[in-house]
Amino acid sequence: MSHSLVVLPDDSAKPLVDAINAAKRTLQIRMFLFTDPTMLQTVLAAKKRGVHVRVMLNPARRDGTSDNGETRVALEAAKIEVHDSNPEFALTHQKSMVIDEKTGFVESLNWEIRDLTETRDYAVTTEHGHEVKEMIACFDADWARQKFVPRGESQLIWCPDNGRERIAEFIESAKHTLWLQNERYQDTVIIERLVRAARRGVKIHILARPPHTLKKDKLIEGVGGLRIMHDVGAKVHTLKGLKLHAKMIVADHKRAVVGSINLAPGSFDARRELAIETDAHHVVSRLSEVAQRDWDNSKKIDLTDEGLLKDLEKRNAAAVGAEMLVLKTHAKAKVKH
């Protein structure tokens, strides 16, 4: 099977650990957050048995917070080559791995305990030679701070290169159904394509994070995007039990995109991201099954003014949110005073 699927937390970290344990020659890792002790020990063990390991880490979050310091110290102590990600990009949010130049992992998950045990996440593995070579080519280019140009006919989707165009085309090609799982729905081009899909009769199921989890500077775009899609007939829910971290789209139960790309301008324009498109039946079938199960374990997001105010109270930001979003309930309250 050229493509296969790992579902988190259902499958646990075992498929990733087993793959690294099977590495014989080379291991290339690119990660936004790498703090999980099991994954770290597995990589250190690979180095100890003679595997050539290279690791590229994002040095810091947008706010300057660095999470990967202890991991970097441990890797370098084991004589593993570690580079910061390419400073050409605001962040390297890509999560991926290539083993023995034969198998590539395209992931939504960080290598941290939470993403491996508590969040809905996915990884697609590929053994297509041209896809693996392209992943290696990008890794080598970013490692050396050189220009990388994606292959036009590839199933790989890269940001900031062709991500927005490829995701827009994927949505445009849907005929009957679209199932989306993503943290952010903020990019106006993607929102426009989803609106057009709804208007041509595509049934759209959107799983999103609740509004109170959005950062203040993303609140207008995030809530606005969800409201626009709801108003044209898309169903908008939030997952119960698990935290949603996945970035996944399934079209017509025949094709899917999985990777690190949030549907936001920053992801498309300023960050190194990677996703993969697949039509492998066993992969798309399982993604569809998980999407349906998650939908059955979700609840509708109340996008009315009252519903948004109630949700925003969960972070003590109802007043700020009401003011920014021009919510009617807030306006009426001000008149009374």
Describe each model-derived feature in a short phrase.
Residues 157-172:
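Extracellular/periplasmic Venus flytrap/periplasmic-binding protein
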Residues 23, 174:
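An anion/phosphate-binding loop that grips the pyrophosphate of nucleotide cofactors and donors
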Residues 153-155:
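A charged, amphipathic alpha-helical module
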Residues 30:
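Cys/His-rich zinc-coordinating "finger/knuckle" motifs
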Residues 1-17, 36-104, 109-151, 163-164, ...:
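PLD/PLD-like phosphodiesterase catalytic module centered on the HKD motif
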Residues 27:
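Active-site metal-binding motif and surrounding structural segment of the metallo-beta-lactamase
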